[in-house]
């Protein structure tokens, strides 16, 4: 069964512009693009609104009948600037972390780094309102992802780039998001 005009869910951040440009300007390829934050990409794919998707890497293992379809990804070897932990004190003094709800992968990554690199065990909270950033208390840190980092990074004394922290801890690159399709879906 061929998908005549595929629906493609992709992240609506600056780092996907090369992918979006390629999809929109490939002369022989038509697709409906669904651009949204990472968590919404997953929802669009899971609920069947997208045939192909750029999904948070952390979401893929839980998706049945899904396969990674290319080596292209949103990944990094070193700093990315758009996936950060912000605080007014050093990470060793962090007691509470407020988590950006837009990326399951980044939430898992900061949890790994807290336990294995920084050796801290903070309390975890959802960052339900970005106004919370203005009311940080001593020991608070904020996981932010995407373009919104640019609006807030200068308001804090400490900024930990999670991709750089991952590489320092593991000596490996990090994949934040990968291209997937349902098994059996033609995608070339």
Residue ranges and their predicted role:
Residues 1-76, 92-93, 138, 165, ...:
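N-terminal hydrophobic or amphipathic helices and topogenic motifs
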Residues 126-188:
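Pocket-lining segment of extracytoplasmic ligand-binding domains
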Residues 72-131, 160-167:
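A conserved helix-loop-strand patch within extracytoplasmic ligand-binding domains
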Residues 15, 106, 110, 175:
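Catalytic-loop motifs flanking and including active-site residues across diverse enzymes
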Residues 22, 82-91, 96, 174-188:
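A bilobed periplasmic-binding-protein/Venus flytrap-type ligand-binding module shared by bacterial periplasmic
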Residues 22-25, 68, 112-113, 156-159:
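Short, glycine/charged-enriched secondary-structure capping and boundary segments
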Residues 11-13, 100-102, 145-147, 182-183:
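Structural motif
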Residues 53, 97, 142:
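Receiver (REC) domain switch-region micro-motif
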């Amino acid at each position: 069964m061929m998908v005549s005009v595929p629906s493609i869910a992709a992240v609506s951040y600056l780092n996907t512009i090369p992918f979006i440009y390629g999809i929109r300007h490939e002369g022989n390829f038509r697709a409906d693009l669904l651009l949204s934050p990472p968590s919404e990409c997953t929802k669009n794919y899971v609920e069947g609104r997208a045939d192909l998707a750029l999904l948070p890497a952390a979401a893929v293992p839980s998706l049945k009948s899904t396969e990674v379809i290319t080596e292209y990804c949103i990944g990094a070897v070193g700093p990315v600037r758009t996936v950060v932990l912000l605080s007014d004190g050093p990470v060793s003094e962090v007691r509470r972390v407020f988590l950006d709800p837009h990326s399951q992968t980044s939430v898992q990554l900061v949890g790994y780094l807290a336990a294995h690199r920084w050796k801290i065990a903070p309390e975890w909270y959802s960052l339900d309102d970005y106004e919370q950033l203005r009311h940080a208390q001593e020991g608070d840190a904020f996981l932010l992802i995407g373009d919104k980092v640019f609006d807030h990074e200068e308001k804090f004394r400490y900024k930990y780039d999670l991709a750089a922290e991952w590489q320092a801890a593991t000596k490996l690159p990090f994949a934040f998001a990968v291209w997937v399709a349902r098994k059996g879906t033609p995608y070339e």
